[in-house]
Amino acid sequence: ASDVYKRQVKHTAKCIADLIEEGYQVAITHSNAPQLGMIHTAMNEFAKAHKDYTPAPMSVCSAMSQGYIGYDLQNGIREELLNRGIYRTVSTVLTQVIVDPYDEAFYTPTKVLGRYMNAQEANEERKKGNYVIEEPGKGFRRVVSAPNPVKIVELDAVKALLDANQVVIAAGGGGIPVLEQDNHLRGASAVIEKDLAAGKLAEGIDAEMLIILTNVEKVCINLGQKDEEPLGEITTEQAKTYMEEGHFGIYNMLPKFRASVDFVEECEGRSAYITSFLSLIHI
């Protein structure tokens, strides 16, 4: 792992330990985009070099990324808690999330994945039935679908750990997308939007608060314009209006607002925050 990644884990662990020290019970999710891309590329390159190996499917790559990041996070948080004299078990739950096979997202893939490819490599990907887009001047990249999360398979395990007063990391990278086929769960060639999965997890464990951490203290409307305005406390109705007006784009802030609105509206007395790590202490 790079030094930057290690510093990020250490910083994240401190911020989460602050919340736990304040008396909060936490379930933690995380993104996995860089790691998933790296694992997927490595698996494909290995399969090219060793023809008797089959490339690992997307679902397996997602599982690997949960183990990779979960391992570092749980040890970072555990160490930080022990340094403060707090004795709590921290564990990562390998989490599968059921998606709808008829989700419209499967017909319009949007999430780029892995390294840039040349035209020949892109053609090989297309022959496998994968979607590829061209980024002018850079090359080609694979794109995968981002279906909505329907149900978290291991939810009861997460709840049991929380009931035992443990710190839980779950639904990392949005969870491993799976399709229900009778009693069988089949991995889907997709990624789940991590913010929506976080909201689904928060609903499932009946959390009082959903906190989505990003790199800005406050989200702005009219971003980059003269009338740019940072948002403070708003209602779900206001949030929906801003979403309809297109203030939050498609791929960045919009899923965070969708998850927040769904979570708050599903049950009375809930709140959601979209803010930075540094602003956690003000919540």
Tell where the protein language model's regions lie, with residue ranges:
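Ligand-binding beta-strand-loop-alpha-helix segment within the catalytic cores
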Residues: 46-168
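Polyanion-binding loop/helix "lid" in catalytic or ligand-binding cores
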Residues: 7-17, 57-76, 80-83, 145-163, ...
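Short, active-site-adjacent cap segments at secondary-structure transitions
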Residues: 33-37, 99-101, 176-178, 217-221, ...
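Short beta-strand segments at enzyme active-site cores
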Residues: 25-38, 89-94, 168-171, 210-216, ...
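Glycine-rich loop at the start of a catalytic domain that most often binds anionic cofactors/ligands
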Residues: 33-49, 224
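Short, small-residue-biased leader/transition segments that mark boundaries at the very start
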Residues: 1-5, 283
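Short, hinge-like loop/turn segments at secondary-structure boundaries
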Residues: 44-47, 109-111, 187, 227-231
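Long, well-ordered hydrophobic secondary-structure segments characteristic of membrane-embedded
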Residues: 11-15, 19, 24-32
